[in-house]
């Protein structure tokens, strides 16, 4: 994937996440974006997605869990998949992580 395609795919991920949080009470969780990052802030933690254009990855860091996961685009699955071979998809992983960290989200679903 070239850099232009990478940036479009990242832009889509960030837009989907921002839309997902539009109806969420900001006292429960909110999203902030800037300079290639997207931060999900909740009472207990900060979850950060960052772009890594040189390696065409999205990196996810979850401070409260001490976790960092790198995701590559998998064209055959049309999804961002972790680079350690476990098959974790970015949105599914993030959904599971947010449920652990922010019980106030209830049945919240990522778009």
Where are these regions (language model features)?
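N-terminal intrinsically disordered, cationic/polar leader segments
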Residues: 1-111
